[in-house]
Amino acid sequence: MPQSSRYSDEHVERLLTELVSVLERNRTPTDLSLMVLGNMVTNLINTSISPAQRRHIADSFAHALKSSVNEDKAH
């Protein structure tokens, strides 16, 4: 069951489109894109979340990421 969000789908899609646009404009390979996005997530957690909550947030994020990855053969 998907979780509801306090953010509108339009807001999320607009930000996603902008981020993808930056990566595409720079012709960023997949491995570098993942590295940069991972560093961004780490930075957000380390600078915006209290130390006591960081591990829990990171675990929740990792779980959500794993749950959203498709396992079909297409790429």
UniProtKB/Swiss-Prot annotation:
**Chain segments annotated as transmembrane:** none
SUPFAM superfamilies for this protein? YejL-like
**InterPro entries found in the cross-reference section:** UPF0352, YejL_sf
Its domain of life reads Bacteria
Instruction: Spell out the Pfam families in the cross-references.
Output: DUF1414
- Note the NCBIfam families from the entry: PRK13689.1
The protein's matches in HAMAP family, at most eight in alphabetical order, are given as: UPF0352
Q: Which family does it belong to?
A: Belongs to the UPF0352 family.
Q: What is this protein called?
A: UPF0352 protein plu2871
